[in-house]
């Protein structure tokens, strides 16, 4: 497949800017970096709630770190497997994907995602990665109707779950709850895919693929009865971005938890050291035998050295492998961790999930977040032409007139809010305390 096809944009551009010698992917990176959606990540929850501490990561700092790790993966792959250099010809592609990968995540992290998915249960669902695709291709006002108007290859790379909602959603949904406060997140997991409202754009992205490649790329599998189906494949660029995201989540969120005293050295010893000291890889055995001495040291530079050692260990354990069944090179090859390091990364991810994500104090914040989001959605849908801001009202009215999914407009609006703005808006709507109009002067 010729490179020019993957460089194409949905809306042709003839911008002639003074002395602008950037390539298409450098332009994509700039559009993402300078977007309002990217800036809002500075006030969105990563794991720990915004405002809990000045040290921890937000979605913005997480995305910057993912970008650094992603470019590091690309650099070491170019050295390690130079035969793939033609496919790794642009650092800006990887930077773009890593910077953009969380743009669609709503306020209050996973709690906000569950809340919007529940409120959209009869209207195509909600999921953060699907919303990222939607922001890049429709919502961000770089163009009037085409979002950021990014290159086809960039959009292919952002597709972590390349299949429509309707093909993946389980047949028998759970019964709705009588009151929002009874909602259990485990019963309403989002479908990881693209919204059916955006199928025409997905078709455009996949247009260069052969019929066989497209069919295979869109395929899914059943995990277990009663669960949503899952997609199987992703592009090479996406596989690099996803590895960078996983490494940042496992290692840097671990660092936040250690610094804030959320996890103890004994918990680390029980759940990580005892497992990875028996790893099949000698490097992992040796490092994890003594890693706790540095990770939990009172000397900050020792902890930082341990974190850097972990990141470097994972980045240098990645190789490009062939994926059977594809002709298109961007799909035929994926980056993957060596098996022992893949196990180690999953051990770290499970440790963070068990002792950080599932910590009652964190779950209380998540619970509060999904109550706020659901009550905002209920208010807006009750009287959209009265409560929605003017720009969003216009989109809602146009959607109604055209017979489109108007609920999606409200999901778009709420998902774009920062944690603080959503909480403040909720207070203005539902708290007896009065507030000024100026405090709510925020259009997306």
From Swiss-Prot:
CDD domains: HDc. Residues 59-250 form the HD domain. GO terms for molecular function: dGTPase activity. The keyword DNA damage does not apply. Pfam families: HD (PF01966), HD_assoc (PF13286). It comes from the Bacteria. Keywords: Hydrolase. PROSITE patterns: HD. The keyword Hydrolase applies. One of its GO terms (biological process) is dGTP catabolic process. Belongs to the dGTPase family. Type 2 subfamily. HAMAP family: dGTPase_type2. This is Deoxyguanosinetriphosphate triphosphohydrolase-like protein. It comes from Shewanella halifaxensis (strain HAW-EB4).
């Amino acid at each position: 497949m010729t490179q020019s096809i993957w460089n194409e944009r949905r809306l042709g551009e003839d911008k002639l800017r003074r002395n602008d010698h950037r390539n298409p992917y450098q332009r994509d990176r700039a559009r993402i970096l300078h977007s309002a959606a990217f800036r809002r990540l500075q006030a969105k929850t990563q794991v720990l709630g915004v405002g809990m501490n000045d040290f921890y990561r937000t979605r913005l700092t997480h995305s910057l770190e993912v970008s650094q790790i992603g470019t590091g993966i690309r650099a070491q792959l170019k050295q390690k497997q130079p035969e793939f250099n033609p496919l790794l010809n642009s650092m800006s592609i990887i930077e773009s994907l890593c910077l953009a990968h969380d743009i669609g995540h709503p306020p209050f992290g996973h709690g906000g995602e569950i809340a919007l998915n529940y409120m959209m249960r009869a209207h195509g669902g909600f999921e953060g990665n699907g919303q990222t695709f939607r922001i890049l291709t429709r919502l961000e006002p770089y163009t009037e109707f085409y979002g950021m108007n990014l290159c086809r290859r960039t959009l292919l790379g952002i597709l972590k779950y390349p299949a429509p909602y309707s093909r993946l959603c389980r047949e028998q949904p759970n019964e709705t709850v009588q009151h929002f406060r009874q909602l259990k997140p485990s019963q309403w997991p989002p479908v990881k895919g693209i919204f059916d409202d955006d199928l025409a754009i997905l078709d455009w992205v996949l247009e260069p693929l052969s019929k066989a490649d497209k069919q295979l790329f869109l395929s899914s599998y059943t995990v277990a009865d009663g669960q949503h189906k899952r997609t199987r494949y992703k592009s090479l660029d996406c596989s690099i971005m996803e590895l960078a995201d996983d490494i940042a989540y496992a290692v840097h969120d671990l660092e936040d938890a250690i610094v804030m005293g959320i996890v103890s050295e004994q918990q680390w010893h029980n759940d990580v050291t005892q497992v990875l000291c028996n790893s099949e890889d000698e490097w992992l055995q040796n490092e994890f035998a003594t890693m706790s001495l540095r990770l939990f040291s009172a000397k900050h530079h020792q902890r930082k050295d341990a974190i850097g050692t972990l990141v470097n260990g994972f980045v240098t354990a990645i190789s490009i492998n062939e994926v059977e069944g594809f002709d298109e090179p961007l799909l035929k090859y994926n980056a993957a961790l060596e098996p022992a390091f893949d196990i180690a990364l999953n051990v770290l991810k499970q440790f963070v999930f068990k002792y950080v994500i599932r910590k009652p104090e964190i779950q209380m914040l998540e619970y509060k977040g999904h109550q706020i989001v659901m009550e905002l959605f209920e208010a807006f849908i009750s009287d959209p032409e009265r409560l929605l801001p003017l720009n969003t009202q216009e989109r809602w009215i146009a959607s109604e007139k055209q017979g489109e999914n108007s609920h999606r407009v409200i999901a778009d609006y709420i998902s774009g809010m920062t944690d603080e703005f959503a909480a403040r808006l909720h207070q203005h709507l539902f708290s007896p305390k009065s507030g000024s109009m100026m405090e709510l002067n925020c259009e997306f």
